[in-house]
Swiss-Prot record:
SMART domains tied to this protein: AAA
GO molecular function, a single term: ATP hydrolysis activity
Top-level taxon of origin: Eukaryota
Protein name: Chromosome transmission fidelity protein 18
Chief site of localization: nucleus
Pfam families: AAA
UniProt keywords, alphabetically: ATP-binding, Cell cycle, DNA replication, DNA-binding, Nucleotide-binding, Nucleus
Segments crossing the lipid bilayer: none
Sites where the protein binds ATP: 321-328
Species, as recorded: Emericella nidulans (strain FGSC A4 / ATCC 38163 / CBS 112.46 / NRRL 194 / M139) (Aspergillus nidulans)
Family membership: Belongs to the activator 1 small subunits family. CTF18 subfamily.
Function: Essential for the fidelity of chromosome transmission. Required for the DNA replication block checkpoint. Replication factor C (RFC) complex has an essential but redundant activity in sister chromatid cohesion establishment.
Length: 993
């Protein structure tokens, strides 16, 4: 085979002059034998023509391909003269071409082809130095004809297929595009396997699947693993009785109950209502201008700043709701989220008024902070102090009265503290007439106060509920889905596998709810929303699940219903947690079935437990009644308030619809049961017959048996109509006597407060409160309701200003303002809220509320003593009253300063030098301008004279102190006190250094 090389020529190559001869020349006898060149390469094999033909084809194809890849400019070679040769047939691509038109160009083609091959061998180019971009391909200059298969050798030419296609561009440039090389044939199996998708981590499919040998190997391994001997089971490791070594906090949490262990400690861990959480945080952020004055965000300057839409911030927050909803936890988490440290006070344990006057007053009235000791390993580090937020828990459990030893009076002292802050906040610059400060006048709320209660309608909370000093937020119960997801995560942390249905059934049983299919429209749980009860029940179920078997069991719905709810012990445990308040119990008394789920029917439930004979059977209706009465008695006994439940049933049954005969049989039977309850209660508390305590709940059960009705759509519509009807009389219903007593007590308090602000002449005229109520107050209301038509004008900042234009109306306004000033009656701007918490507008409320004393019954035919007053009328009166108060304060200050300047001789300064004395004696010289006109000096006002005299006196006093050389020593002690203050300058502090 010939040696083929497309790179540089070796030193032993044939000289170029021997290769410039054309193919097909006949050799002469006198000349030496010429060497054969095929396709631009030397062929030394003369013996085997067939081998040379194959080598020629291969070398021709490879040289053509490599020259095209090098992409170098081929120089043109001039046509050299050649000897005339006889015409030979032309073969192109293995076919005979009889076209004689191109015979002239054939010889030029042969010469150019041979010379280009020689030049290519003389000027080798490395393949790595040639660029292969498309742009270089277009720049190649090809001056020779591309079809090189027209070489006519002396022997028959081989059949050579074309390797490129000639393309001519628009600008006349010719390009050669190589044909696509034949690729290896791909089998159908591999083509199908390449198109199929392979899952990650799975074996790659080839030839329609996995190799059968690998499958056999894997199956053999599985058989061997199954036949291998299993290891002996390891005994369960029992927990050690020794205390674990670690953090003290982790020890406490590991041994703590679930109610404390899984208490929410971050804002993101709260599962309650989001609206309630945001409302509490918004109220706490309202304290930022007071607690964090440097970090408080400045209000954005709006183009139209409507001051009326700004809601006044209230200093006290009251959280109310049923027990177990997480009110205390919510207050703690929100306070820490807002940057406070919580100071918790339990009002049930510390119910004395001294606690309010001591700890609570000091915490709220001072700008103190509270630090904490944080344990980092074995060391205790003092944490940076934070402002204090006071949380008073269970405020509805305090004693409303006041004992001799200070017991009770908690809410009264707290209410007085709130009202004192309200008075000090509303007070401007006026002081007492005698100039002395009263005790507690300067108290202000500087820290937030949060109150937590269960019943907002408790008697002890009436002052806070009726006044506008506290913002009341009703804590809503958490959604069942949130509680289920949280309990499922707790079971996962405890290592107990559970199903969602099982956890849901556990929550429903803890809340006293029925199943979804058995739950009706009016069926509610006795402890619905109580998260604490769910945690207690879940912990008890977890212990039971662990103790039943050593193998880990799964908490499912079937296991819970068969092993816990159907069991006597477990059923009584869940029923004992179904406690509710008095209002909930009374609502259940007058509901058929008491709102409980239906009892599961069985063989035992169809028999009377109090009858020994087997022949007596009980129907389904009596089974439901018996089940409801038993559960209702359990709720009454769990609440422990038997007397209140009975009295509430007595006051509520006249308003309930029930069916009875004309002889009033059911009310007579109810009175007999009330007599029975009074007899049992008196025997228990007087004769100490505690054995009769089990019969205290029977009267409540009797009311349920007599007056319970079905709760359907008709009764719901009936109740809606009753709520929409206007009340016939303010003191109507079963509790009319109590409502009248409370209203009388409230009116007496208003009268005493109004009468205490009277002057001596008014006290001589109106000595008793009855005279004030009948003679003075109706006329005062008419005086403060003048017949005027004010004009309301809004400024650029959308602040409304009301004014009157007529002189007669101005006179009426001035007389009304004089009445307000003499009696101490003011108007306070308050915000009206709708039931849903929306903004309902603004109104001016009279303080003290004298208009409430002259509004009588709403019965048709009776009207109020006065007509309703417009908002603009009271706005005009309030504006004029404020102007009058400012004017009087300025007059009092000026009169006080003038009296001091005239009575004290120290205020008059004598001239120090004789020149000033001469001026005072002979008068001052007249000042004239350039033209000789007299310049009039401005005469200072008396107020300016007083200010100049005071400034001169202060300067003289400072000179005396500096001349005397008085020294002041300043020492620092832990804390601070505002009892004694003295202004000291830096010169006095640095004078002794």
């Amino acid at each position: 085979m010939p040696f083929i090389s497309s790179a540089e020529l070796s030193s032993r190559a044939t000289p170029p002059d021997l290769q410039k001869r054309k193919y097909g020349e006949q050799s002469q006898p006198s000349e030496p034998k010429r060497q054969k060149i095929m396709g631009g390469f030397l062929d030394d094999d003369d013996d085997d023509d067939h081998d040379g033909l194959e080598a020629f084809n291969e070398a021709q194809y490879q040289s053509e391909f490599e020259i095209q890849e090098q992409r170098v400019d081929l120089p043109q070679i001039s046509q050299s003269g050649s000897r005339a040769e006889p015409k030979r047939p032309k073969i192109m691509g293995g076919f005979l071409d009889n076209d004689d038109d191109d015979d002239d160009g054939l010889e030029a083609f042969n010469d150019a082809h041979l010379e280009s091959q020689i030049d290519t061998q003389e000027q080798p180019v490395k393949l790595t130095e040639v660029s292969r971009s498309q742009s270089t391909l277009e720049s190649v200059v090809i001056n020779s004809v591309t079809e090189r298969s027209t070489i006519v050798p002396a022997y028959a030419p081989p059949n050579i297929s074309p390797t490129s296609v000639k393309i001519k561009t628009c600008n006349g440039k010719a390009l050669n595009v190589p044909l696509k090389k034949p690729s290896a044939r791909v089998s159908y199996e591999r083509l199908i396997a390449s198109r199929s998708t392979t899952a990650p981590g799975r074996a790659q499919k080839s030839y329609y699947g996995i190799d059968i040998h690998s499958l056999l190997n894997e199956s053999a391994k599985e058989v061997k693993a199954a036949e291998a001997p299993k290891p002996a089971p390891v005994a369960d490791v029992r927990p050690s009785i020794e205390a674990p070594i670690g953090d003290k906090r982790s020890k406490k949490l590991s041994t703590a109950m679930w109610t404390e262990k899984y208490r929410a400690r971050k804002y993101t861990e709260l599962i309650g209502d989001e609206r309630t959480n945001r409302s509490i945080l918004r109220w706490l952020r309202g304290w930022d201008p007071i607690v964090y004055p440097s970090l408080a965000r400045a209000k954005q300057n709006k183009k139209y700043n409507n001051d009326e839409e700004e809601r006044p911030h209230r200093k006290v927050l009251l959280l109310c709701g049923p027990p177990g909803l997480g009110k205390t936890t919510l207050a703690h988490v929100c306070a820490r989220q807002a940057g406070y440290e919580v100071l918790e006070i339990n009002a049930s344990d510390e119910r004395s008024r001294d606690v309010v006057k001591g700890r609570i007053r000091d915490a709220l009235g001072t700008e103190n902070v509270k630090g904490m000791n944080v344990e980092l390993g074995e060391q205790k580090v003092r944490k940076v102090g934070r402002p204090v937020c006071v949380v008073v828990d269970e405020v509805d459990g305090v004693v409303s009265g006041s004992g001799g030893s200070g017991e009770g009076g908690f809410m009264k002292a707290l209410t007085d503290l709130v009202l004192l802050d309200q008075r000090n906040s509303a007070r401007t610059s006026e002081r007492a007439s005698d100039g002395r400060k009263r005790k507690g006048d300067n108290f202000r709320f500087l820290r937030p106060l949060i109150l937590v209660c269960n019943d907002v309608y408790h008697a002890s909370l009436r002052p806070l509920r009726q006044s506008s000093v506290a913002e009341i937020i009703h804590v809503r119960q958490a959604p069942l889905e949130n509680v289920v997801s949280r309990m499922k995560s707790i079971f996962t942390l405890e290592g107990i596998p559970s199903d969602s249905d099982g956890v849901r059934r556990l929550c429903e049983a803890s809340w006293g709810l029925a199943k979804r299919k058995q739950r009706g429209v009016r069926s509610t749980g006795a402890a619905e929303g109580d998260i604490r009860s769910v945690l207690v029940a879940a912990e008890w179920v977890a212990h039971k699940l662990r103790n039943e078997s050593s193998a880990p069991l799964r908490l499912t719905r079937n296991w819970l219903e068969q092993r816990v709810l159907a069991d006597a012990g477990g059923g009584s445990f869940f029923k004992g947690m179904n406690r509710g308040g008095v209002r909930d119990i009374v609502d259940r008394v007058f509901t058929e079935g008491a709102g409980f789920p239906d009892v599961p029917l069985g063989d035992e439930s169809l028999q009377d437990p109090y009858d020994r004979s087997e022949a007596v059977s009980v129907d389904v209706a009596n089974i439901k009644k018996r089940h409801a009465i038993r559960r209702l008695c359990e709720m009454v006994d769990a609440s422990g308030d038997h007397d209140r439940c009975t009295s509430e049933c007595f006051s509520s049954y006249p308003l309930q619809p029930y069916q009875d005969d004309t002889f009033l049989t059911k009310p007579n039977a109810a009175y007999d049961w009330l007599h029975f309850h009074d007899t049992i209660s008196s025997r228990i508390y007087s004769a100490h017959d505690w054995e009769l305590g089990a019969y205290l709940s029977q009267a409540t059960s009797a009311f349920h048996l007599l007056f319970a009705t079905a709760q359907g759509k008709a009764q719901q519509q009936y109740r809606e109509i009753d709520e929409e009807e206007e009340e016939a009389h303010p003191f109507s219903g079963p509790r009319a006597d109590y409502a009248a007593f409370e209203a009388t007590k409230q009116n007496q308090a208003i009268l005493s407060t109004f009468q205490s602000s009277f002057s001596a002449p008014l006290l001589r005229l109106f000595r008793s409160s009855n005279n004030v109520a009948t003679e003075l107050i109706p006329n005062v209301i008419r005086m403060l309701s003048p017949d005027i038509k004010p004009v309301v004008v809004r400024g650029s900042e959308q602040k409304s200003v009301a004014s009157v234009r007529k002189e007669s109306e101005r006179a009426l306004v001035q007389s009304a303002v004089r009445v307000m000033t003499g009696l101490g009656v003011t108007f306070e701007k308050v915000r009206i809220e709708n039931e849903g918490g929306g903004h309902g507008g603004w109104a001016y409320r009279m303080e003290p509320p004298l208009d409430a004393l002259v509004s009588f019954s709403k019965v048709p035919g009776f009207s109020s003593a006065t007509n309703p007053v417009r908002y603009a009328v009271r706005q005009v009166l309030d504006q004029e009253y404020r102007k009058e108060s400012i004017r009087k304060n300025s007059e009092n200050l000026s009169s006080t300063g003038s009296k001091k300047s005239t009575t004290k001789s120290d205020d008059i300064e004598t001239p120090a030098n004789p020149a000033e004395a001469a001026k005072l004696k002979y008068g001052t010289a007249v000042k004239r301008d350039f033209f000789g006109r007299i310049i009039q000096d401005r005469v200072p006002s008396p107020q300016e004279d007083m200010e100049q005299a005071l400034s001169r006196k202060a300067k003289s006093a400072q000179q005396e102190l500096s001349s005397a050389g008085r020294k002041v020593w300043v020492t620092y002690h832990d804390g601070f006190s505002n009892a004694v203050r003295k202004p000291i300058s830096m010169a006095e502090l640095l004078s002794g250094l």
